């Protein structure tokens, strides 16, 4: 992996990550597939970087809105 690729991954992680929970957004139905794809990409990158990934997925809130989440131990 080149230094540029490492910086790109670090920037992506910094953009989406907090210590415990991150990448949490409410999205309309049209955006679900796109966002799930993004979460899966981030999930894989975090594993490649050697961090322990706890959970990734989607929850349906009581008001029927969807919330996406990704938990990681960094």
Functional labels for PLM-detected ranges:
Residues 2-18, 35:
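Short amphipathic alpha-helical heptad-repeat segments
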């Amino acid at each position: 992996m080149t230094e540029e690729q490492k910086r790109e991954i670090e920037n992506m992680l910094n953009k989406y990550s907090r210590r415990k929970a991150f990448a949490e957004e409410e999205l309309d139905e049209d955006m679900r597939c796109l966002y799930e794809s993004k979460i899966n990409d981030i999930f894989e990158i975090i594993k490649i970087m050697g961090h322990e990934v706890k959970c990734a997925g989607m929850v349906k809130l009581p008001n029927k809105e969807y919330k996406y989440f990704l938990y990681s131990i960094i």
